[in-house]
Structures are given as structure tokens and as C-alpha cells.
Amino acid sequence: MNQPQIGTYNVGTQLTVGSHQVEIIKYLTSGGFAQVYSALINPPDPHSNSSVACLKRVIVPDKPSLNTLRAEVDAMRLLKNNRYVVSYIDSHAAKAMLHNGSYEVFVLMEYCERGGLIDFMNTRLQNRLHEFEILQIMSQVTQGVAAMHALQPPLIHRDIKIENVLISANNEYKLCDFGSVCGIIRPPRNSQELSYVQQDILKNTTAQYRSPEMIDTFRGLPIDEKSDIWALGIFLYKLCYYTTPFEKGGDLAILSGKFEFPLYPNYSEQLKGLIRDILVQDPRHRPNVYQLLKRISIMQNVPCPINDIQVVQAPSSHLNLTELHQLSATQNILSLNSPTTMENTMPNATFQISMADNTTTAQMHPNRKPSQIAYDASFSNSAKGSQPLFDKSQNMYHALDPPLVEPLASSVSNNDNELKANSATKLKQAIVSEAHTFRQNNSIDFPLQNIIPQYEDSSSSSDESYSGDVDELKKTRSLGSYSTRGNIKKNQSVKESLTSSSLPGTSFTPTSTKVNLKHENSPFKSTFVNTIDNSKDDLNKPSYEDLDVSKQNLKNSIQQRMIDKLNSSEESFNARKMSKVKLHEKGEIDKPTMLKSSGPISKDKKTKPTPPPKPSHLKPKPPPKPLLLAGRKLSLDK
């Protein structure tokens, strides 16, 4: 947008601005669309009791710009009675005669005859500002900002800088230029709002004074009073060192938040610490305007000039979601800091978490009270006589009380022995009952003394008689004689041979000790299972009271049976071998069908199929020969 080309008023030009008669005294400066004059007004300003005022003439090209200027005038009207803000006197707007569609606006305001703060600082280049001067300027400018933040809803200046502070005739520093004033800007919710906020920030703020949340709008932080606090920190740094802390780095330096203090001029650590506390990346950790003024007042050794304006107020329509969260957090902090204790108004739980009856906790504590069950995380409030988990009077869990812990430990120690005794008894009963049913179902009346003799005090004779039986058992087990159901008959034959052939002429009465072979019910069919049922008096009786059997006969009988078995197995092997030889001679032996030899398989190379001949019409035709090569002569004369 091009700046309208307008001329300046001559000295003595008279105008009417609202209810005041104005006469131009002097042309002061111009910038942008505005021109500034000093003028005489009638009637005088009641606030400053002066007849000299400042006239600001602005050419507004369109209605949106007119609305922006109207917002500036409205902000000045709200801050009219503050001594550290340039006061508003009167205003007027009319259609401009110079440009089509543009407006001409006149604003009368307080005249600060000592000029701007930037001019005063330029006069002190060699003799820099002292710390008490810096604190005085900072205190007065901050009070002007506090007047804006105290409004409901609060206003944000957004363009606090050295150039926007004027000095009155009474040596008071006043905040001016409210053209960038706005309310709280909530975080943008879509790309359109994001683009609008970014363009608005670029238009209405100064680069070196922008806060991190203004530069990085993707942080999702609101632009509120804390952005003005950041600008005040930059303002204070420039008062001290005549430059901004992020002058060289730009936006990246602001986002990093790292800065240094020059060696000259040298200021107190309190002042440097105040700058550090203001220039914090997170706006929630920056002080508000009251806290900032209080710190400055302590350094000046004067009382704080304002009351705490950051009080908890009822939510209103202008508060956004972030402010409501901050409001609730502030209320919680105030309630926690109050001396009165709040009662627990939480209702009882309507749900119940149950535990299995066979858990370790339930087994170890079978006789616990309902209040003790809560310690095992059952959380049942519906049981009769149960106590809540949290005691309002003592503010501690019942499970941590000493009277509950001691009986708990004793009950654990008392029940350990009972559990061990009960488990041993149950295990013994289960073994006895299982053995009883096993004997009834799968019992073979077989005298165990004939295979495994019982232990006696005189171990010499029993060991000799036992050696042959052990060898027999090892051999028969290795051959799998007790692994299938079909070998029961073999076991019976062994029984008969032991009772008849090895014991001739004797009457044998079997005892109650039996070998029980479990064939069908065993989970592992090839396992030899035996159980021993001992009667009351069998353990103390001798094994061979009425038996007169020679040891040599018993050994001979066992050896003879083993030789017979070996001979029979050799004969069967020879018979099978002869049958195979005969079949081979006749040519009826089975031939392998899969592989003819055990050597490696040789892979034959596949022959590629011959492609069919190409049709003649698809064969490429040679290009026609030139006429010279075809035997014809070219006649050039035609």
C-alpha cells in the first residue's frame, strides 16, 4: 500500500478537533501515515492544566485501518487518568479531500516537551545512565503497563520499546503509541488462524522485542501480558547497555534464550538477576507486572506503588481455555495455602475389585478382618464392618498402622506349621488311595521274594541269592520283556518255572507282597511300574523259612532259559536270511523304485526348444538400392 502524499500544515493554521479549537504552533515529526504538531488548544487540558497539546494527524486509506486507529483511541480513553501514560484529550475523523476513499483523523493528546527517551539516551553516550536512573525509568514505564494489564479484559501493548517512551515537563516517563494494542490472543487452532496471527505480529511488533511465543507460534502458547513482560526485560537491558541482548543472533538467539552481559558499564548483580528472571523462555515462569514492580521497589528501597492486580476473579466471556486452566490452578494454590483444612468429600467407590480365593494372600490370612483385607488390595467398601482405606482424621492408611502389622506377622508364622502338616497328611492319603486303586485294577499275584529278596540282618546269603536275580532283571528290562501287554504270558511262565522247576517237592505259600504291573493306565507305556504293598508283619519275617533250594540249581535254570532264548533268536534270524536268499535267486526281491544308486544325482542339462520359423511377412525387408547401384544411370540433363 502506497503512502498518501500529503502536505504539512503551516504555522498558525486553525482547526477544530472535537470540542477543542486548535492552532498549529510547530511541525515536530512524521512517520508512516502520521504527522505530529505542537498546538494551542482551547479549552486547556484539565488533566495537565496546560493549553499546549500534541496534535497527531493521520491519513487512513481504508476502513480497516480506520478501525485500527479507533482501537488506539479507545485504549487511550481507558488509560486517560494514569500519570505514566500519555493522556488523551480529544479526537475527530472526517473524509479526506486529498485522496479518494481515504479518511483524515486528528487526535489531541498530552504534549511531552522534553521529547523521547531515545533522545535523552543519545545525550548520555559518554556518561551512561546510572542504576538509580534506570530503576526510576523502569518503575514508571512498568506502572503504565500495569494500568493496561489491570483492565478487564486486560490490554497488551505489544510494542514496548525505548522509542515509545516520552518525557514530560515534570520529568516523568510516559508510555505512548497504542497503535498495536490488542487483547489476549489465544493459540491458533487451524492454519488460517496461524497465518493471520503471524502476519499480525510482523505488522504490529518490533523484531528485537518479540517474545519467543510470538516468534514460534507453533508452541501453542497464548500471547498475553507475559509477552509485555518479556518486552520490558529487553527494554531494561537496553537502558543499561544501549543494545538488545539478542541483537546479533536474531530470532534464533531469542528462541535459544542465551545472552550475556557486557563488561561495561558495570551494574549490580540484583539488576542483572532481575533481567535474567524476566527473560525466561517459558512465559509461565516470568513474573507478572506486580511482581516486577515489587522487585524494582525493593531495589529502590521504596514501597510498591500499586496493589496486587493479579487477583483471582470469576471467569468471564473473554477468558480462553488457557486462562481458565491458570485460574483453576491459582484457586487450588490459594486453597492449599489457606489455614483451614478441607474435608474429604469424595464419594465411596461404587465398584469392587475382588481377588481369587486360591491366591497366596487368601491362603496365608484365612481369618483376617474386613479392614485388613484392604491391605491386600481387595478395595471392598461394601463389606460389613469394613473401614475406608483413607482415614480423614489421621490422614494415613490403616495398613500402615502398627497394631495391624504385628498380628499380621504372627498369623503368618502360626499358619506355616499348620500348612506343612496339612500338606504332608494330604499327600500321604493321596498316595495310599492311589496305590490301593492301582492294586485292585492291575494286580498280578507274583511272589516278590523269588525275584527281589527282602533285606535281612545276615546279608551274606541274601546277597548271593540276589546277584543272579539282578542280572536277570537287567537283561529282561533291556530286552523290553515288561514293556508290552503281550509279555504277560512270559511273566506267568517265569512265575511257573520259578515255583515248580526251581522249587521241586516244596509247598509254596505266597505272601501279601506283590508285583503290580500297570500296562494300560500308565501314561508312558514302555515304563515298568511296580508298587510294594507291605503288610504289618512281612518286614520282620525271613524270606525263605520253608524253602530248601540249592543256589546252583537256581542259577542253572536261569542260565538255561537265557541260552534257549538266544538260540531261538539266532534260528529265527537264520531263517529270515535264507528266505531272502531264495527270493533273490528267483528274482522276486523288492527293487528300489526311487533311487538306483547311492551316488550323487547328476542333473542333465535341459535342451532349449527350437523356436518356430518366423513368417515371411514379418521378416525385415532390405531397403531398395540406389539407382546408381541398380545399374541405371542418372540423367542430370532434363
UniProtKB/Swiss-Prot annotation:
Q: Which GO terms describe its cellular component?
A: actin cortical patch; cytoplasm; mating projection tip
Biological source species: Saccharomyces cerevisiae (strain ATCC 204508 / S288c) (Baker's yeast)
Fetch the InterPro entries from UniProt: Kinase-like_dom_sf, Prot_kinase_dom, Ser/Thr_kinase_AS
Any one biological process term the GO annotation gives = regulation of clathrin-dependent endocytosis
Q: Which principal EC class is assigned to this enzyme?
A: transferase
Q: What is its main location?
A: cytoplasm
What GO molecular-function term can you cite, just one?
Answer: protein serine/threonine kinase activity
Q: What is this protein called?
A: Actin-regulating kinase 1
Function per UniProt: Involved in regulation of actin cytoskeleton organization and endocytosis.
Q: Where does the record place the region Disordered?
A: 482-518, 569-638
- What high-level taxonomic lineage is stated for the organism? Eukaryota, Fungi, Dikarya, Ascomycota, Saccharomycotina
